[in-house]
Every structure is written in structure tokens, then in C-alpha cells.
């Protein structure tokens, strides 16, 4: 600590200034606070980045205390006093509750507080005992809680990392409570962030699972870096300060502790058979890899994956489990709907409707569970021969008072029941009314089970009768969104009634039943036994799904599961993906079916009063029965308490044992650890889940923890061991280890593909280079063909070749993407125009060939023109020097990724062509999975804050955000990716399928798995839509010039990449001295800046600029610096990945090592020490080595060449056919073209451009508007003009050339759009417009459009109305 005393500055005398560099704090003492002091504080904080605390500084405003009390308004009763001591504001508060409440208020009013208090003021709390009268007030009081207690730790010296050692008492983030004290805080590290600046600061985020804290390391960063990692438990010691309204620890010492992990210490481990991951749609936060890692740490032999409704995590789960050496069990928690349930039950005889007696009944009860709830009202109506002949009604006094909730639902009060008969008195009488009738009810299971159970309780009878459910009848006979009794009554037009009173409900249900009888008779159903035929017509969307666990037993089972999942998304999706019970029965081979949670069919039936015989019948369907810890139900669950759940589980155990079924205890895992519950709460908060904050204990449990929970239920150690350890392991042993994907390519089959590719390649090679081929060509072609054919990739080349040829024959050029241009075979087959050979001359006549080994020429297009020394014909120039390895790996075994850019207009036709080639059921769009991004996760956590009223610390918010980030939101599709299934396989051999984002109107199916996970098994063809080929097609149509024939060394075209001279415009007025506005890849402000700095003079340099602009950390903070410092020229720096391999091989490096270095660098992995050493041995320049270290991503040269080739062709038309260029540009890229502004002239355009350029944070529309106006201004400066839309001349969508002007199309009129524009042209082609009235009558034009057209002169001399004359 450095100290300076009695320092005078301006008019201020400083008693002392103390500097603590370890804490990054400056303590200043002054006699009186003033504006000069405030200015000095700001200056010091800005220049030093230290925190400045002013001791003794108090604003002169004597009313400061009053203003603070005013700010705290409603909290004033809890404040005993406000005291200023030096730089401290001490709030003396009445009790712990007051402290917490006021601290929360201070955080929410931080901005106002900062304006009131002098800089550096520390806020302290002093808790005093509240007076008796305050405690008696009707205000929320906390439970009396003790001052947070720290723990004493024994610290080993070898664990100490640096600085001060921990204090005797150590706190955790949720227990800290005093500021400005030397404090030690223990927690788990969940984030480490390094902030670079004048001073480097390391932020360490600690948590104890309840709260989190930011710890700042200032001057000892190098002592900490690399010494602690995520997941470590540390003790950080330092000054605990209030910073930005929340506690922050300024670290002066760190000690690492051995982590006290939850571990599974059971000698025999359990198996988890029910777990959800982040792929369960916005419901779970378990990371797949962390789940498997934990299972491995605990020694579990196997674990299952059962996400809600999908299996998208399977590929990731398998890879993680395989690496961990544990058995992966694939599964799903399905949304099962029982489409096989009977409409009429217990029917033991047959009868016509007329000869049967029906009793339609309804009960009002105290709750939903017949085991514990009671009947309080009976209403019943008897029907004979289609007529209502009798009624029964009574209220019943229950054994205990009814709840307020029951009264609210039923309208029955306790007073109404006081003098009524008991159920024991009523039931015998009601049974007499029922006689031998068939019972009818709406949602009949509910009423029937209550009646049967209470007959058993009261009379000891095992009573069963046939019963019909009008709910099931409604789902068979009506099409509705809701089948509640109210909705059905309304649908049938039966008038209003008083719902939730038993007799009223029974009467109206009787009317509903009689109407249904009429409807059944009309479709030929006249007997009771025939009612069952209706179940085949039940709408699956009307059936309520229940949970069901399905596990994959073998490969056949996996395929069957994929089929079921596919149908659930494609055929039966309604709110959730539904699996029909009938479909599961049909595809059950290789699957094990579990009863799932208490929301499953079996659990639900048990809670709704099903008899043992009913439960046995339901349980027979399942291979195993699940029970779960009682605390997987939230503590305040209204409809189910834990004692009742215990009874249900014991009953299910007895039934399962009787049926010889396994009973297993599962965890219904949704997060890994108990402390993660808040993360799931934050995930559910914005989703309308009313009980989100009270999270059940859905964490992964150890064997001991699960045994303890089993004992709570069964109170028997043998049963506990059976359900926790033995049975789950037995099920795991029944399951084979299945590999979902083979990680080897299954290409589609095209007969003789190998021979065709070889034949086409050689034929074209001979045509271009002659027979015999030059040695360099022969070797390259043979090497590539051998790699392509031997690894089974010929079919990929053939598909791409056919696609490109089809597009070209239809008049649309195709651009290549990625590294396909690295392949000479691809070039010879016409897949790409990029020739990867070294720069060379070739003669089209006599086949003379010569490679030019001259470092001045990086591209064949740059070679000087020459005539053939043999025959005198002009030589062709080509070659871009791209190694094949960048495409298919050093061994030529990497799956070739052929990406093609089709015209946006042609893309759909290209996709249809692929479908025709292989069959629609063998071509699917490449699926994607969209997850919650970090920014969106912040929104979830903010919603959690708002709904709970809990202000979170920044560190705790970071913790929750990290848990939510990556949770699946929805699905989508790759913009052009097509996955091809070989003809000898089904798609279900690889993946389920679905609609993208579950949109039935999408018209296409996607792979259920994200395409990246199946990329190694299936061929993916990228047929993307792009503007540039459309641009080229329109230019070709406008000029009649084939763009593939233009000279790629045209000097004027090349010149616009470094000046505006060929355009003939003033660079000052254009505000650019390069002419690339509107040129793809070169028109952006960033790339134009690169062009200005580098002034490229060759095609090869344009390729370098393209590579530099598409890489990450390749130009800025890298190549640009080496050029400016004079270490290298543009032609020397690393611009594309291929540059590294070529340069190192040129230096004499062994090619395989050069390839490895290139691969490392392009992926942002830098270079190893061994690689660096080898580079230095070959005298590779230091700047080159440093450049490799800085690069995060490198663009492939082949991709850059393809982009530049397309751009150069478009630029050629801009220079030599300007109006055609501008017509095409504004037609295709002019979405933000504003005719109203443009027609005002040059000065108005310049003004708007200045406004746009001055804007910060422009959205996409504003950026596009700026780009369009730049091209508009350039066109005008070149001497051309725009003509307003004309009702007689304009096209719907295209800019038309008229003399030296462009006629604006109709769709550029604001608010008009393509549809209206096309209607105008269509009507005009039928016959000319005769009036405005005629125009509006025959088109989609409205009054607002007409007003705009009038203002711009679009209507010309068109009269307003029809004019008729006799002569």
C-alpha cells in the first residue's frame, strides 16, 4: 500500500491518498466534498482503471439523509437511522428481513442512488433488534434466522495458489452479508472471463448452487491463469465490496480445494432408465455429455436417454457413451394416445337401443381421487325406449368439511350439506334406482369409478355394470376442438344449462345421448354391441395423450422406434408428437415399453380409482412398471400428496408382482444436481408454467440416494434393492448395445457410376489437354480418380455433374462453393469452373501445354497473352494452383462435400430433379435443430426475475443463462441440403423424419436428426439458392452474351477493383475511389476498404482479398499488420487455407506435415510446439508463424476463386454493358429501392445517404437501403437516369431499358407488391386500360395505390371514368 499525505490540487487539499494495487483501489481523504473532488475521482478512475473511494467525503446537501429516506419510501418503517461515517453510508435496519428488503430496493434504485451519493460511497448495514410493535404490524416478517455462519476449513499448503491465505471462517456466495471486510468465499468455478485493456482483469464466477458471486483478480492474473479450471472448488480471499449494487470480491489470494462431489459409493450400481436432456423441448437442462460423464464417474454400467417426444440426442448420446465405456440405452418418453380404448365397457349381453334401459348420471365430488374424495351430489336420469321416464337427485353429507375450492367449482356449500343423508344411507337407495340399467356419463370413467369404489366401501359389493361414455361417442361422431360437455351441448344446439350441478348435467347429458343414438342409427348402428365399431372413427387429436417410456432393445427396435417417431410428427402431430397405441402394438418388436411417470396411463388410472382388475388389464400392456421418488412431485402439488402417491406405488408394485412384471425405480431426470433446479425454473418461467418456481427433485441420484427414496415408499430393504438395483440392471442386460450410425458413407446407387465418371473425365481431359495427357495432368487425374472411385464417391460426382448439366441446359449457370474447385475431376466434369492445376497455357488447337513456374503469377488468368509456339493459335490461360488435399484430405478418403449455388429461381427445380433421380421417398431435406441462444437465455432469466420478484446478482444470472443456453426450441431445414437414401435402404435405417418446425404446410420432409450427425452416413447434396446465378442469367438474357465466354483478364474490368476510372465518375462525388458498388463479395464497406488499402492489380490478388475478407482474424490484427509493417506484400500473406500447405511444401516441408499444419490453422487450433520447430528449421519467417497462431478460421481457396470468378463476370457487364447491369441489379437486389426518393434526383439521394451513413446499429433494411442508394447514385453519375413507373409501359417486376434510362417497375411502388403488380400487367395484356375506374375493376389496385400513382405521374393521361359517346 502506497500512501501520499497533504497533497494540494487546484483548490482542494487532500489529507491523504492511499493506493492499493493488489485490490485495484485508491482511497482518498478530503475535508470537504466538491465538484473538483468529483472531477479528480472521474479522472483517476478513467486513467488508472482503479476504483476510487473518497473517505470523509459528504455532499454539502444537508438534506441528503431525507432524500435517501424518500428514495426508500415504503421501507422507512424498517430503518432506525441513516448515518454517514467518512465514505460510508450506514443504514441501521430493524432485523434481517428489513436488511434483505432494503438491499433489494437499493439494487433496483442504483441509478438514483449514484446521483445522490458522492463517488466511492460504501453502503453498510447495521442490523438492530426490531421493537415489539413493528413485529406486531401486519407486514410480512421472515422467520428468525441466524446470522450466516461460515465454516472452518483446514487448508493444505500445496493447494494454495497465490496471495493471502483463507481466513479462519469461510463463507459461500449465498451466505455473505458484510461488506468492506476481509472475507474468504468458497464456491465452485463455473465461468472464467479475461478482460483485456490497459490492465488485465480476470473475472472468476463462483457458486454454491443457491447464489453466485463475481471475484475480480487485478494484478495477479498470470499467477491464476491455467491454475484453476471450470468445475474447481476454490476459496477466494479479499475485500468484499458493493459494486454496482451487488457484492464483488476483490481477490488477494486463491486456494484450491478438493471438490466434495456427490459420489456413488454403493458396491453394486443402479441403472437410470428415465432421463431427459436439453433436447426435451424446453423442459430439461441436462447436457448429454455431462449426463454420460456423471454416469461414468459414478460407475453406472448403463444409462438410458428418454427425451420427450423425440430421439434427436441419440447420435450425441451414443458417441459420449461409447467414449465413456458405458452402455447407451436409447429411448423416448412418448406421448401415447390410446386409440384402442372401448366406447362401451363391461358389455356382457346385446340389445337394441329401444329394448335397453339407460341411466345417465353425474356426480359432484370433493375432489378427483375416489380413494380419498367423496360424492356430495348425485343426479341421474332414466331412459327407456328413447324417452326420459324418471329422475333421481340428492345431496350427500360428506364425512369432513368440503374445501373452498370444491365449493367454488360445484356451487355447493357446507351449509347446503349439513342436514343431508350420508353416503351409507343414499347408496342402497340409488342402487335400487339403477336396477339393471346401462350407465351413461360424460367422461364416464370418473363417475363409474367413484360409484364402484364407494359401493365397495359402503356395501362390500364387487359391483360392475356396462357403461357408455358420451365423451368417446362425441369424439367419434363430431369434429370439434374441445369435447367438454359445454362444447358438445353448444355444438348440438341443446341450449344453456347450469354446469357443475349434478342433476342439470345429467339431464343435458341425457339429451346429448339421445341425439347420439339418432346419429348412430343413421350410420347403421342399432345395437349395443355395434357401438364398439365407432372406436375406429375416433379423431386421434381428440384423445388425451399420456406418458409412456419406450426403450430400444436391438437394431430392429431402433428402426421401429424411428418409424413410430416419424409417424408421430408426420401423421399424428397435434400440439405434441403423438404415438398411437395401435401403431406401437404393430411395431413393438425390439422395444421395451415402460409405464413412465405418474402421468402415464397406469398411474393416472390408479389415481382415478381404477379397480385392481382394471389396473391389471392396463399393466399387461407394459414390459416394466416405473415408480419414482416421492419428491419428483412438487411439495405443494394441489391434486396429489405424497402419502397418496406412496399408496399408489405400493399398489402398483403388488399388481406388477402378480403379473410377473419388473418394477423399476427411475429418476425422471431433468437436471443433474439438486442445485440446478433453479435453472429449470428459469427455463419454465416464461412458458406459462404456474408452478415453475417450486421445482420437484428431478435430479440424477446415486444408488444410495435412490435406495433411501425407495425405503420411503416400501419400507422394505429387499424391495428397495430389487427396484433400485436388481431390476434396472436386468432390463439393461436385456438390451443389446446398438450402434445408431455406422460412420461410413452409404452412397446412393447409380449403375456403373465408377465407369461413367472415369469415362467422362478422361474424355474431357483428352479434349482439353490432348492424348496422351501431359504428365502433371495425367498424375493429378489418376490420383483423384483412384481416391474418388476406391472410396465409393464416384456417385457423388455423378449426381453433381448431372445437376449442373441440367441447370446449364435450362439456361442457368451454377456457382460452386467450398473446396470442390480443388478437384480437377470436378472441373473436367463441369461441376466447377475452377481449374486447380498450376497456372498454365494450353492450345485449343494442337493441345500444346506449358506450366508457368513464376511466382509473379498466382492465377492462370493473369498470364500475359501468347500465341502457340507450335501452331500459332492464341493460347488459353487457366489454373489456380489448389491442392486436392484441401477437398478430400491427405489420403483422399474424406467424404467430398459438393456445394452448388443455383439461381434462386431454379433451386426448387434442382431439388425436384434430385427427387426424380432417386425417388421422392429416398430424398429428404437436411434437418436442423434450433436451440436457445445465449441472448435469448438472458430473456428467460429476466422473465424468471420478474415473475418471482427476485433480483438476481449478475453472477447468478450468468449461471442460469449457461444452463438454459443450448436447450432445443424447434427444428428447421438446411437452406439447400438434400440427404440421399440409397435404394437398398429405408430412411428409418438412419433417421426418423418430420416436417420442418412441425409445419404440415411445409410440403417437404426433413431428417429428424441434425444433418451434421448423419453426414458421414448419408450423401448430402447442397443445392443452394443464390442471387448471383440469377443475376448472370438476366445479364445473359439482356445482352445475348454468354457469361462463360467473357475474357477473365479484361483490364478495364480489373481496374474497377482499384479505381473508378473505367466508370468515368468523380470519386469525391461518389464517395468511393473503387468501382465495386453492386459487385457480389466486393461491394461492402469492409471489402471496399481492403481494396483501397491493397489496390489489387491481378485476379490472384482478388482471390486473396476474397479469402482475407471471409476468414476470421486473418486480415484485421494479422495480414493487414504484416503488410503495413513491411514484412510482406499482399501476394505473400496467408489469405486462404491452401496458402499454408503450398508455402510450406515450397519451403521443403514433407507434404503430410504441411497438410496437418494447414488443417490445424484453418480450424483455429494454432500450431503445436513441434510444428513451430519444424517451420523454423525450414527458415519460415517469424511473421508467418505468428500469423498462423492468430487465425481462427480460413477460407478455402477454391471457394474464393469461384466467388471472384462470378464477381468478375458481373463486373465485366457493369463496365461494358452498364444499363443492362443496373437493370439486373435493381430487379434482383433492389428490395429497398424507393422510387419516390430516387425520382427527386441526385441531391435528395445524397442527403439520404448521408443520413444512413451517420446511423449506428443499422438493421438489415437500412443497410440494404444504403447499398441500393449507393448504386443508384453511381448510375446517375455515369449519365443515366430513371423513368417513373408508367401504367402503359412498366413491367411488373423488372427494370426496363429505354434509351439511356431505366423504367421503374410497378412492384417498386411503396405498398404495392408483386401480386398487385402482376395483376396490372396481366390485365393490360388482355386489353388496354380505358380509365382509372377500369384499372381498379380489373386488378388488385386499391385507392391508396391510385393516390400514389397519381402523385408520381404513373397514370399519365388515363381518364378517371369511362366516357361514352354516341358518335
From Swiss-Prot:
Do the record's keywords include Disulfide bond?
no
Q: Which GO terms describe its cellular component?
A: cytoplasm
Which class of enzymes does this protein belong to? transferase
UniProt keyword list: Cytoplasm, DNA replication, DNA-directed DNA polymerase, Exonuclease, Hydrolase, Nuclease, Nucleotidyltransferase, Transferase
Would the keyword NAD be found if you checked this record's keyword annotation?
no
Gene3D superfamilies hit by this protein: 1.10.150.870, 3.30.1900.20, Metal-dependent hydrolases, Nucleic acid-binding proteins, PolC, middle finger domain, Ribonuclease H-like superfamily/Ribonuclease H
EC number(s) per entry? 2.7.7.7
Q: Which GO terms describe its molecular function?
A: 3'-5' exonuclease activity; DNA binding; DNA-directed DNA polymerase activity
Please state every residue range assigned to the domain named Exonuclease.
358-513
Name the SMART domains for this protein: EXOIII, POLIIIAc
Q: Which GO terms describe its biological process?
A: DNA-templated DNA replication
Reactions it catalyzes: DNA(n) + a 2'-deoxyribonucleoside 5'-triphosphate = DNA(n+1) + diphosphate
Please list the disulfide bridges. Answer: none
Q: What InterPro entries does this protein's entry cite?
A: DNA_pol3_alpha_NTPase_dom, DNA_pol3_finger, DnaE2/DnaE/PolC, DNAPol_HHH, DnaQ, Exonuclease_RNaseT/DNA_pol3, NA-bd_OB-fold, NA-bd_OB_tRNA
Q: Where in the cell is it found?
A: Cytoplasm
Q: Which Pfam families match?
A: DNA_pol3_alpha, DNA_pol3_finger, HHH_6, PHP, RNase_T, tRNA_anti-codon
Protein's job: Required for replicative DNA synthesis. This DNA polymerase also exhibits 3' to 5' exonuclease activity.
Q: Give the protein family.
A: Belongs to the DNA polymerase type-C family. PolC subfamily.
Which HAMAP family does the annotation name? DNApol_PolC (MF_00356)
Provide the protein name: DNA polymerase III PolC-type
Origin species, per record, is Thermotoga petrophila (strain ATCC BAA-488 / DSM 13995 / JCM 10881 / RKU-1)
Amino acid at each position: 500500500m502506497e500512501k501520499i499525505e497533504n497533497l494540494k490540487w487546484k483548490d482542494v487539499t487532500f489529507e491523504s491518498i492511499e493506493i492499493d494495487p493488489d485490490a485495484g483501489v485508491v482511497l482518498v481523504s478530503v475535508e470537504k466534498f466538491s465538484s473538483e473532488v468529483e472531477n479528480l475521482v472521474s479522472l483517476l478512475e478513467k486513467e488508472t482503471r482503479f476504483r476510487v473511494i473518497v473517505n470523509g467525503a459528504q455532499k454539502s446537501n444537508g438534506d441528503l439523509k431525507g432524500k435517501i429516506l424518500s428514495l426508500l419510501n415504503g421501507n422507512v418503517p424498517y430503518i432506525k437511522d441513516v448515518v454517514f461515517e467518512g465514505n460510508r453510508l450506514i443504514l441501521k435496519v430493524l432485523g434481517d428481513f428489513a436488511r434483505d428488503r432494503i438491499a433489494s430496493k437499493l439494487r433496483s434504485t442504483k441509478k438514483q442512488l449514484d446521483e445522490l451519493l458522492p463517488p466511492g460511497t460504501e453502503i453498510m448495514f447495521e442490523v438492530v433488534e426490531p421493537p415489539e410493535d413493528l413485529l406486531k404490524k401486519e407486514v410480512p416478517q421472515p422467520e428468525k434466522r441466524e446470522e450466516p455462519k461460515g465454516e472452518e476449513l483446514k487448508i493444505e499448503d500445496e493447494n494454495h495458489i497465490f496471495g493471502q491465505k483463507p481466513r479462519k471462517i469461510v463463507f459461500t456466495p449465498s451466505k455473505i452479508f458484510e461488506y468492506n471486510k476481509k472475507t474468504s468465499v468458497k464456491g465452485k468455478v463455473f465461468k472464467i472471463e479475461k478482460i483485456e485493456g490497459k490492465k488485465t482483469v480476470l473475472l472468476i464466477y463462483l457458486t454454491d448452487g443457491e447464489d453466485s458471486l463475481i471475484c475480480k483478480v487485478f494484478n495477479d492474473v498470470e499467477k491464476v491463469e491455467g491454475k484453476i479450471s471450470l468445475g474447481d472448488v476454490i476459496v477466494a480471499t479479499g475485500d468484499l465490496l458493493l459494486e454496482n449494487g451487488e457484492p464483488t470480491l476483490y481477490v488477494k489470494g486463491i486456494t484450491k480445494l478438493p471438490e466434495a462431489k456427490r459420489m456413488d459409493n454403493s458396491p453394486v450400481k443402479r441403472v437410470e432408465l428415465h432421463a431427459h436432456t436439453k433436447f426435451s423441448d424446453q423442459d430439461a437442462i441436462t447436457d448429454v455429455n455431462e449426463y454420460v460423464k456423471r454416469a461414468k464417474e459414478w460407475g453406472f454400467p448403463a444409462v438410458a436417454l428418454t427425451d420427450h417426444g423425440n430421439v434427436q440426442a441419440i447420435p450425441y448420446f451414443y458417441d459420449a457413451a461409447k467414449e465413456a465405456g458405458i452402455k447407451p440405452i436409447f429411448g423416448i418418453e412418448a406421448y401415447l394416445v390410446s386409440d384402442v380404448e372401448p366406447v362401451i365397457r363391461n358389455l356382457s349381453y346385446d340389445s337394441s337401443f329401444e329394448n335397453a334401459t339407460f341411466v345417465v348420471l353425474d356426480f359432484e365430488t370433493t375432489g378427483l381421487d375416489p380413494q380419498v374424495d367423496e360424492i356430495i351430489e348425485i343426479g341421474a336420469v332414466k331412459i327407456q325406449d328413447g324417452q326420459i321416464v324418471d329422475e333421481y337427485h340428492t345431496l350427500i353429507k360428506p364425512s369432513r368439511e368440503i374445501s373452498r375450492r370444491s365449493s367454488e367449482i360445484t356451487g355447493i356449500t357446507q351449509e347446503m350439506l349439513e342436514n343431508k343423508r350420508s353416503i351409507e344411507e343414499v347408496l342402497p337407495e340409488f342402487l335400487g334406482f339403477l336396477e339393471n340399467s346401462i350407465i351413461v356419463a360424460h367422461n364416464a370413467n370418473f363417475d363409474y369409478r367413484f360409484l364402484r369404489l364407494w359401493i365397495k366401501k359402503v356395501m362390500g359389493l364387487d359391483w360392475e355394470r356396462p357403461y357408455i361414455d358420451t365423451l368417446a361417442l362425441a369424439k367419434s361422431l363430431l369434429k370439434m376442438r374441445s369435447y367438454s360437455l359445454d362444447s358438445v351441448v353448444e355444438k348440438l344446439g341443446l341450449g344453456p344449462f347450469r354446469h357443475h350441478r349434478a342433476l342439470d348435467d345429467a339431464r343435458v347429458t341425457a339429451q346429448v345421448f339421445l341425439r347420439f343414438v339418432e346419429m348412430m342409427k343413421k350410420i347403421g348402428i342399432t345395437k349395443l354391441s355395434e357401438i364398439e365399431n365407432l372406436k375406429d372413427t375416433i379423431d386421434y387429436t381428440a384423445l388425451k395423450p399420456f406418458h409412456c417410456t419406450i426403450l430400444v432393445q436391438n437394431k430392429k427396435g431402433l428402426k421401429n422406434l424411428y418409424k413410430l417417431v416419424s409417424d408421430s410428427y408426420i401423421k399424428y402431430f397435434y400440439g405434441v408428437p403423438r404415438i398411437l397405441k395401435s401403431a406401437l402394438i404393430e411395431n413393438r418388436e425390439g422395444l421395451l415399453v415402460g409405464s413412465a411417470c405418474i402421468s402415464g396411463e397406469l398411474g393416472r388410472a390408479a389415481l382415478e380409482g381404477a379397480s385392481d382388475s382394471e389396473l391389471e388389464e392396463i399393466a399387461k400392456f407394459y414390459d416394466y412398471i416405473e415408480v419414482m421418488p416421492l419428491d419428483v412431485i412438487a411439495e405443494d402439488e394441489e391434486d396429489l400428496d405424497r402419502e397418496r402417491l406412496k399408496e399408489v406405488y405400493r399398489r402398483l408394485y403388488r399388481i406388477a408382482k402378480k403379473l410377473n412384471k419388473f418394477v423399476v425405480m427411475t429418476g425422471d431426470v431433468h437436471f443433474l444436481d439438486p442445485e440446478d433446479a433453479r435453472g429449470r425454473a428459469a427455463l419454465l418461467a416464461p412458458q406459462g408454467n404456474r408452478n415453475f418456481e417450486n421445482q420437484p427433485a428431478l435430479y440424477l441420484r446415486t444408488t444410495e440416494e435412490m435406495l433411501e427414496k425407495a425405503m420411503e415408499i416400501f419400507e422394505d430393504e429387499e424391495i428397495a434393492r430389487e427396484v433400485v438395483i436388481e431390476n434396472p440392471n436386468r432390463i439393461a442386460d436385456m438390451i443389446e448395445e446398438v450402434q445408431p450410425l455406422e460412420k461410413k458413407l452409404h452412397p446412393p446407387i447409380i449403375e456403373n457410376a465408377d465407369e461413367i465418371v472415369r469415362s467422362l473425365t478422361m474424355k474431357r481431359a483428352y479434349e482439353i489437354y490432348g492424348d496422351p495427357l501431359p504428365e502433371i495432368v495425367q498424375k493429378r487425374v489418376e490420383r483423384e480418380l483412384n481416391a474418388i472411385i476406391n472410396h465409393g464417391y464416384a456417385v457423388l460426382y455423378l449426381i453433381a455433374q448431372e445437376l449442373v448439366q441440367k441447370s446449364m441446359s435450362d439456361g442457368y449457370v451454377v456457382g460452386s462453393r467450398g473446396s470442390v474447385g480443388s478437384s480437377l475431376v470436378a472441373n473436367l466434369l463441369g461441376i466447377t469452373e475452377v481449374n486447380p492445376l498450376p497456372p498454365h497455357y494450353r492450345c485449343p488447337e494442337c493441345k500444346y501445354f506449358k506450366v508457368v513456374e513464376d511466382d509473379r503469377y498466382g492465377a492462370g488468368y493473369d498470364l500475359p497473352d501468347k500465341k502457340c509456339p507450335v501452331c500459332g493459335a492464341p493460347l488459353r490461360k487457366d489454373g489456380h494452383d489448389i491442392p486436392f488435399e484441401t477437398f478430400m484430405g491427405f489420403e483422399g478418403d474424406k467424404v467430398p462435400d459438393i456445394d452448388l449455388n443455383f439461381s434462386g429461381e431454379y433451386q426448387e427445380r434442382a431439388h425436384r430433379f434430385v427427387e426424380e433421380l432417386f425417388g421422392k421417398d429416398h430424398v429428404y431435406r437436411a434437418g436442423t435443430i434450433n436451440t436457445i441462444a445465449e441472448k435469448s437465455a438472458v430473456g428467460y432469466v429476466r422473465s424468471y426475475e420478474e415473475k418471482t420478484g427476485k433480483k438476481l446478482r449478475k453472477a447468478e444470472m450468468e449461471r442460469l443463462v449457461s444452463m438454459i443456453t443450448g436447450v432445443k426450441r424447434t427444428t428447421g431445414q438446411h437452406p439447400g441440403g438434400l440427404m440421399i437414401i440409397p435404394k437398398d435402404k429405408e430412411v428409418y435405417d438412419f433417421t426418423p423424419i418430420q416436417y420442418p418446425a412441425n409445419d404440415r404446410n411445409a410440403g417437404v420432409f426433413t431428417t429428424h436428426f441434425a444433418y451434421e450427425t448423419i453426414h458421414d452416413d448419408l450423401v448430402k447434396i447442397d443445392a443452394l439458392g443464390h442471387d448471383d446465378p440469377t443475376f448472370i442469367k438476366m445479364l445473359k438474357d439482356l445482352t445475348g452474351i454468354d457469361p462463360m465466354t467473357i475474357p477473365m483478364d479484361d483490364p478495364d474490368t480489373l481496374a474497377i477493383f482499384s479505381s473508378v476510372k473505367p466508370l468515368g465518375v468523380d470519386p469525391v462525388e461518389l464517395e468511393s475511389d473503387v468501382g465495386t458498388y453492386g459487385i457480389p463479395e466486393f461491394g461492402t464497406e469492409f471489402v471496399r476498404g481492403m481494396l483501397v488499402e491493397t489496390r489489387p492489380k491481378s485476379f490472384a490478388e482478388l482471390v486473396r482479398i476474397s479469402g482475407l475478407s471471409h476468414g476470421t482474424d486473418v486480415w484485421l490484427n494479422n495480414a493487414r499488420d504484416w503488410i503495413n509493417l513491411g514484412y510482406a506484400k499482399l501476394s505473400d500473406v496467408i489469405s486462404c487455407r491452401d496458402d499454408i500447405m503450398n508455402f510450406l511444401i515450397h519451403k521443403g516441408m514433407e507434404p503430410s506435415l504441411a497438410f496437418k499444419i494447414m488443417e490445424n490453422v484453418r480450424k483455429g487450433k494454432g500450431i503445436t510446439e513441434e510444428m513451430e520447430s519444424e517451420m523454423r528449421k525450414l527458415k519460415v519467417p517469424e511473421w508467418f508463424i505468428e500469423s498462423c497462431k492468430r487465425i481462427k478460421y480460413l477460407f478455402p481457396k477454391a471457394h474464393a476463386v469461384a466467388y471472384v470468378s462470378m464477381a468478375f463476370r458481373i463486373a465485366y457487364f457493369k463496365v461494358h454493358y452498364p444499363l443492362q447491369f443496373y437493370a439486373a441489379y435493381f430487379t434482383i437486389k433492389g428490395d429497398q429501392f424507393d422510387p419516390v426518393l430516387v425520382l427527386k434526383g441526385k441531391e435528395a439521394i445524397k442527403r439520404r445517404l448521408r443520413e444512413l451513413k451517420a446511423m449506428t446499429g443499422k438493421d438489415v433494411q437500412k443497410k440494404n437501403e444504403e447499398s441500393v442508394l449507393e448504386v443508384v447514385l453511381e448510375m446517375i453519375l455515369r449519365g443515366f437516369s430513371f423513368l417513373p413507373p408508367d401504367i402503359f409501359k412498366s413491367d411488373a417486376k423488372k427494370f426496363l431499358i429505354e434509351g439511356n434510362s431505366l423504367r421503374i417497375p410497378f412492384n417498386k411502388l411503396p405498398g404495392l407488391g408483386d401480386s398487385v403488380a402482376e395483376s396490372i400487367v396481366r390485365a393490360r395484356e388482355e386489353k388496354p386500360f380505358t380509365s382509372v375506374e377500369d384499372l381498379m375493376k380489373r386488378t388488385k389496385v386499391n385507392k391508396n395505390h391510385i393516390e400514389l400513382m397519381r402523385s408520381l405521374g404513373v397514370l399519365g393521361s388515363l381518364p378517371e371514368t369511362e366516357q361514352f359517346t354516341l358518335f
